[in-house]
Amino acid sequence: MVCAARNLLERADAATAGMWPRAIALLTRQALEDALIELWSVRASGVEGCSTRAQLLCLPYYLGDEKLAEQAAYAWSGLSRACHQHPYELPPTSAELLAWLQAVEQFAAQVRSVVGKKGD
């Protein structure tokens, strides 16, 4: 999903203006939520049943990297706002989308590392 979001970000043009920011936000947020589910399946089964906001509150303890957990929570919040159309808000800029995308990539890499260590 992250690759698809990155491809959309790199190919955005005037013909798709207004559509691609929300599509990128949806794909990126889904990638973050998938990484959370992967983490909980190994570290704390059952947490995935809680709201994403509650999962993000628990994240620093289980991830082992408080700064990265905060970045993931910040990215999720921004991505969630971007996924919903509000007439009084501008869509996110490509720079914002890229920053959130990079935060999700780092988070997913850390989750893969944590999950891999548990399986060893």
Regions found by a protein language model. Name each.
Residues 45-120:
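Long, charged low-complexity segments
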Residues 21-41:
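Short, hydrophobic, well-ordered secondary-structure elements
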Residues 1-4, 27, 34, 75-78, ...:
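Amphipathic, well-ordered alpha-helical segments in soluble domains
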Residues 8-16, 38, 42, 83-90:
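Secondary-structure edge/capping motif, primarily at the C-terminal ends of alpha-helices
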Residues 1-19, 73, 113-120:
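Charged alpha-helical initiation segments
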Residues 16-24, 28, 67, 92:
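Conserved aromatic-histidine-acidic binding/catalytic patches
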Residues 1, 16-18, 33, 38, ...:
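Solvent-exposed, well-ordered amphipathic alpha-helical segments
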Residues 11-14, 30-35, 53-63:
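Short, mixed-charge, low-aromatic patches
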